[in-house]
Amino acid sequence: MKIAIDAMGGDHAPKEIVLGAMKAVQHFSDVHITLFGDEGKIRPYLTSDERITVIHTNEVIEATDEPVRAVRRKKQSSMVLMAEEVKEGRADACISAGNTGALMAAGLFVVGRIAGIDRPALAPTLPTIGGEGFLFLDVGANVDARPEHLLQYALMGAVYAEKVRGIPRPRIGLLNVGTEDQKGNDVAKKAFQLLRETDLNFIGNVEARDLLHGVADVVVTDGFTGNVALKTIEGTAISVFSMLKEALTSSFLSKLAAAILKPKLIDLKKTMDYSEYGGAALFGLNAPVVKAHGSSDANAIFHAVRQAREMVANDIITTIKEAIEQNHS
């Protein structure tokens, strides 16, 4: 199995990308990785090149670049070359922690969209209090969505939850402003009807306040709403941990309490760290494309490789194509 990685994408590239790639090949004996980027910057961190190939390029798509223009003009960038590797069949999947918009553009223009999919969706797996996690899509690939798009998101999400996460008959929820059947705007109401008519295990509308309680295994929404919800969850988690840290270091007694609570706090932080689930998969393309978080460290890259490997091993793309074809028939 071959996985292509953009070694120059992300806040900590190429060091953490390279370290994560080495950890992955040590852990997975069937994985071969191709790193794309500045070889002079990659090699100092590559202490072992067993099953790792480096393809040199100086060109990089920066975080500040306009996504579509960058993909079209920077043909020799590490990200575009990575996507080309998948398109030409020399790699089975690809991963980047770089510019999200550019990766989505490279996915569409280079890797290509599955026939029958109107719009791809960006789908991270987020943590829940019970530790099960839930798949959330779309979180920003498309700010607007029609009812049929939300149905396609649900079909793709159900395949991933079942095949990769091992959840039989995953519960599908539609993010809404209330749980009643007739809640929401026109798009939500029509999407509700479409989802109810499928063979999916559709549990109805779910509210944002219940997401981290594991109310559903897959939650679908438009990219604008999904991105706002995702950033709210991220920001709240960061703020809560900051407040806890301040409260537990404000006095001698609180520091004693912190020492006692430290193992539990570490466990809690690990539970809420969604890098453990891998990156955000870009569903609807002809091959697995994984967007790792921009601040990914080596461990996050390792989990992104694990995720991509599982998507390839479980032939997710073929199953998604079959689900879409069946829905159209």
From Swiss-Prot:
GO terms for cellular component: cytoplasm
GO molecular function: phosphate:acyl-[acyl carrier protein] acyltransferase activity
Record keywords, A-Z: Cytoplasm, Lipid biosynthesis, Lipid metabolism, Phospholipid biosynthesis, Phospholipid metabolism, Transferase
Transmembrane residue ranges: none
Main location per the UniProt record: cytoplasm
Subcellular location field: Cytoplasm
Cystine pairs: none
GO biological process assignments: fatty acid biosynthetic process; phospholipid biosynthetic process
ATP-binding keyword on record: no
Class of enzymatic activity (EC top level): transferase
Domain of life (superkingdom): Bacteria
Catalysed reactions, semicolon-separated: a fatty acyl-[ACP] + phosphate = an acyl phosphate + holo-[ACP]
Keyword Cytoplasm tagged: yes
Pathway listed: Lipid metabolism; phospholipid metabolism
SUPFAM superfamilies xref list: Isocitrate/Isopropylmalate dehydrogenase-like (SSF53659)
Cited function: Catalyzes the reversible formation of acyl-phosphate (acyl-PO(4)) from acyl-[acyl-carrier-protein] (acyl-ACP). This enzyme utilizes acyl-ACP as fatty acyl donor, but not acyl-CoA.
PANTHER family xrefs: FATTY ACID/PHOSPHOLIPID SYNTHESIS PROTEIN PLSX (PTHR30100), PHOSPHATE ACYLTRANSFERASE (PTHR30100:SF1)
Subunit-level organization: Homodimer. Probably interacts with PlsY.
Family that this chain belongs to: Belongs to the PlsX family.
Full protein name: Phosphate acyltransferase
Gene coding for it: plsX
